[in-house]
Amino acid sequence: MRRGITATALVAALALAATACGSDDESGGSKSSGELSGTVTWWDTSTVGSEDKVFKKIAEGFEKKHPKVDVKYVNVPFGEAQNKFKNAAQAGAGAPDVIRSEVAWTPEFADLGYLAPLDGTTALKDQDDFLDQAAASTKYKDKTYAVPQVIDSMGIFYNKKIFKEAGVEVPQNIADLKTVSKTIKDKTGKTGLYLRGDDAYWFLSFLYGEGGDLVDAKSKTVTVNNPEGVKAFKTVKDLVDSGAAKTDATDGWENMQSSFKDGKVAMMINGPWAVADTLTGKEFTDKANLGISPVPAGTAGQGAPQGGHNLAVYAGSKNLDASYAFVEYMTSVETQAQTAGELNLLPTRTSAYAKQEAADSEIVQFFKPVVETAVERPWIPETGSLFAPLVTEYTKVLTGQTTPEKAASTTGDSYRKLLKGWK
């Protein structure tokens, strides 16, 4: 998942300044007495105001289990965490003991030498229980550098009340999406779709729907500028130009969420991580008003990206034993069942889906088959860096500053500079 939330940057910055971090001596703990102790600093990147409260509460449960361990919880804005961690790790000061790493960041951090290998540690308890597609992003050069915390994909969130008022059905493909959006506008005056324009992760479903991809890692070939990529850029441009969708070049997360929660738009593309926040909106005081359906198919079929988050341990941590134990606790079956029940987040452990909390979550049950067929991103160190050049061109296309053809070509050129020796 890539959310790019930035609204809490100031709060997180203040918290970081005041928080002792993993590379500091005071983090040191000892297991010589058979009891864990010391400090574990955890950088969480979950949604502020909903997810963070639950994760902080769960982390406090670890402290109760291990009274001599102090977990310092810091919520770092998702859009800042990747570079903030790299800068701290490179400097050798200020990095946390444990970071919530977006799946694409993990191979990059491992390649840079910033993560502790976890094979043979308590962090990987019951390793065979993890879903194969969730575990794939944790491995780099035959070693395991993280533990899967949550897995996700994307779907269309829709307002059932608005759909009923307009007399429309859930769109199955892009043509349907345009027709449904026009009908909603004509009959209710509301915009059909909010298409987030400041995060290229929201572009991937359209790219995959046309049969395209960013790169082909096996052949080391850049593919974003293939005809399928151009078609995907044309598709998103047409949605905005036709009035089927509205977009913004900045503050996309906040604008998208508020527009949907307040009933100003009928649809948005989002994932399980957005459910808890969405249900706080006035339109969804009755939770049954929220509908979720697969992302509308493109000409090649329906495609949605596989996302998620891992928990990784900083290689320079002064308290590795407690950090390993914390990761094991935060990714346990019980913890994953709890987050499925309270936040509708998808577990990465097979056995967690048999727990009542996961079985009772309609959101989890909807997204589970979506995740099983979602498109994996290439697990290469550079994957996390592919989004910066892509979002620049994606935003330009949506705001009329460039053409789909030029956007695809420019993105491809940027990738070839980043991926040395690739075609």
Regions found by a protein language model. Name each.
Residues 181, 221-249:
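Glycine-centered hinge/linker elements that transmit conformational signals in sensory
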Residues 164-166, 241, 372-423:
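Conserved C-terminal helix/tail region of periplasmic/extracytoplasmic solute-binding proteins
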Residues 133-137, 290-293, 340-389, 396, ...:
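Long, aromatic- and glycine/proline-rich binding clefts that accommodate carbohydrate-like moieties
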Residues 96-99, 126-162, 191-192, 291, ...:
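A structural signal for short loop-to-beta-strand junctions that line the ligand-binding cleft
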Residues 2-18, 22-107, 297-300, 322, ...:
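Conserved N-terminal structural module of periplasmic/extracytoplasmic solute-binding proteins
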Residues 106-114, 134-169, 196-218, 305-312, ...:
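Periplasmic solute-binding protein
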Residues 103-153, 178, 186, 287-292, ...:
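Hinge/lid segment of periplasmic solute-binding proteins
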Residues 60, 166, 234, 238-245, ...:
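Extracytoplasmic/periplasmic substrate-recognition and gating elements
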